[in-house]
Amino acid sequence: MFIRLCVALLGLNVLCQAQVRFNAGMFGVMEARQLGPGTMSGRITAIEGVNADEGKTLYIGTAGGGIWKSTNAGASYKSIFDKYCQSIGALAVNQKQPKIIYAGTGESNMRNSVSYGVGIYKSTDAGDNWKKIGLDSVEHISKICIHPENDNIIYVAAPGPLWSDSKHRGLYKSVNGGETWQQVFYINAATGCADIILDPKNPEHIIVSMWQFRRQPYSFNSGGPGSGLYKSTDGGKTFTEITKGLPEKPFGRIAIAMAPSDSRQMLAIVESKNTGLFRSSDGGETWQNQSASLNVCARPFYFSTLVFDPNDAQRVYRPAFQFAYSNDGGYSFSEASYDGGWVHSDMHALWINPKHTNIMYLGTDGGVYMSVDNGITWQFNHGLPVGQFYHVSYDLKTPYNIYGGLQDNGSWMAPSAAPGGIGNGNWNRVGGGDGFWTIPDADGKTVYSEYQGGNMYRVNLQNMKSEFIQPQKTSKEDKLRWNWNTPIVTGAKNPQHLYVGAQYLYVSNNQGRTWK
């Protein structure tokens, strides 16, 4: 038999939960302590370095862990943004006055687990203190550009809300260091600004990519008539659309890059019916389609980074599913071999030290990696505990254990206390994929782990063997529809009962061996 999900009751539960209010007094004298884990880290959205100190000072923006700073080239990090919104979309360092930093909140890698932001912040003391300086309603910020000649002029690319129309989208400009803002380019309420480039030799020349998108509960539409590539030659007063050589509309997201050493050389990855790589040799006036691998053109809505070497227009890097590079200005790309060891897939940020361009830092769904040989080998930067937990549970042992699933980093468990404190070595992996629900069984020897699409396993903690236990449809049943984040829980009154939900609610009383 099936226990059908009661939609009305589920909706009532959501409404009840929405009315709960939390305040600091509910925690009394309890203080939070950091348990980690830092062994796998989490999604990195932005990396910026300070040019003046040989790249020793780094700022790392994360999808759900705020901003972190290193003053020793990534050997260690400290959190500098705990009091504010933890979803970071963009960072910018004023290289003329490197104590001035801008942080745009609201990640712009528009997947189904993205969090919105609350505006843009400014620090004038290298991240010790921050002040919100506006753009409260844009929700997501994808790029911040500081004018290379007049650092009071700042441009902000705002894709805008993920789930709804909004007039607070587009390209914003400040001429007074962020004290006030003007929306200088706007298409419509469904289209925002995804990327912006200032010509370093003539910063009145601006290239922007506009992006129409909308996420729904069960789908994501990346693209529409509002998307396109535009150019301004007067500092953002007027814009004209660039079309020559680009594919037929509609477009989705467009990633753009300009060579700092030769601003005539540009590359763009254009999401369309036939997503492709395009090259320009005249500053973006005309474009030519280039053959490129699936990895180079993969998922532009999620992989939107394309970077030229600061000093060499022939060297280009494309972080995506994997890391790719070009030695001929983007005419061809090669996939990195990772001779130095594994690097986490799903890559979103890359900062290259302009004084030593062999040194670079790569931001992935699994943290930050450093290379000193142009991306041939990589070293993982430990000590960034910014993993994104979807769900957390615990058992009743002494000390009790903590269980949880992390975005793109599997499912893990660790004791709540250990001699000398909890370290990375105390965390043990019990599942793969995008870890979601991770639930201990009442027998104390078993844990249930689940990853995307309702794929669930029973794990024996004594020998770490796992067995697939997802309920399967019979010939008389409808095709089962599993959520990306599928709930799996044990019974409150009878912990021997295990419940999972597709469009039906299933129960098992034998650890998932059979279901009804």
Q: Whereabouts are the PLM-identified features?
A:
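Bacterial Sec-dependent N-terminal signal peptides
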Residues: 1-20
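Beta-propeller blade termini and top-face loops
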Residues: 19-516
